[in-house]
Amino acid sequence: MERFEETMAAFGQGKTDEEEEDPIWIDSDGNVDEAAYCEMLLSRHPMKCIHNQLYDVDGHITDASMNRAIIDDIKVYVHKGLAKKVTNLLDALKIMCSVNEMPIQDDRIHFQNGTYFIDEDRFIPDKEFCINRLPVAYNPEAPKPVRWLKFLDELLYEEDIPTLQEFMGYTMIPTTRAQKMLMVIGNGGEGKSRIGRVLRAVLGDNMNTTSIEKLAKDRFCPADQEGKLLMLDDDMKMSALPDTNVLKAVVTIEDKIDLERKGKQSFQGRLFVRIMGFGNGSLAALYDRSDGFYRRQIALQVKNKDQDRIDDTKLGDKLIEEAEGIALWMLEGLHRLIRNDYKFTISSRTARNMDDIRKSDNNMMEFYESEGYIRFDKSCHATTKRIYGAYVQWCQENVEKPLAEKTFTQQLRKDAEILGITYDKNLDTGGGKKARGYHGINVMVNTENRFL
């Protein structure tokens, strides 16, 4: 973005007091010739427009930046309706340089000073049109980011640092192949947000900061993530998400998706944004207890803050000074992730943490694993009513809030294959009666007096 504005300033076309001739895009009546102006602009600064968004060799150009450049050019000549003329010129410019799409290149990283080819471990100083150019330079001689590594050692358990390294590297290229989002969880005050500052230094405007809740609820929010490498929620809300479909789709999407911008026709676009969140608790769903919701998450638990630690108020700035070295560190994580076929390094600590999170959000998981209430046995069967009765009894005796009967039965149907049980809507209950139930499960407690 800064490079675009610097270039446009260097090519400023507004007439000065010393100039006598009007530029070629001013017609004989003194009006701006929109076609001629756009041709001039594209000749001095080549651009492409995809889905109403402008890009140059350095990546995305915001409408605000383009508007400022146009105003600087035409303000000497347009004395009425300046804002409308700027809007018309921007619209015309987008039409003239419109293309269907640019290739999504996940085999290379567009650094500020050139192109790095991942598979070849090769850098060239040449630039090409791209959707994502990082503001940080590729410098193989950059010093080791010692402050950053010390910060991570104080923040995370040693075995979890490779996970963060791989995920941060994952955000350097436009792909969702790993199909994961990362949550960094703590009690507050540990310094998690400094990770976001470092990522901003490396990714620049290729990173958006917004909330996961907004992404899930606001139908325009997914379109805001088009062309972005990372969406960061630096203060996750603890309230459970009522709908997780959009979130799950964004994390895993590998094809086009319907996107909508306010006041615009919806369109089919590609998203490759990754999601990272910082919070005091895990991401929870109000209704979604599917394996898919939890399978897409990695949750890293930070260390407790050392009560004797003296916070360095300038640490964020010091970490940013190491951006080139941190970029190499991220690149190392990306190479490892690719070698492992986009499977993240997950410590036993994090695996247990994720299992605990899932069980705490869905107490049916703990009920399945409980002893003395139910037993999985292919020779047995039980009605859904009796299974739910055993579940309610387990909740009462473990101070858990039972799910509603309908919610329980729906989830049990979804879990049946994993549990190795078979649904039967006409289970023989004796005395000529039939009821819904399952083969392969035995209820071990008396539910008659506790549940009707």
Positions of predicted regions on the chain:
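Trp- and S/T/G-rich repeat-edge/linker motifs of beta-rich repeat architectures
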Residues: 57, 61-74
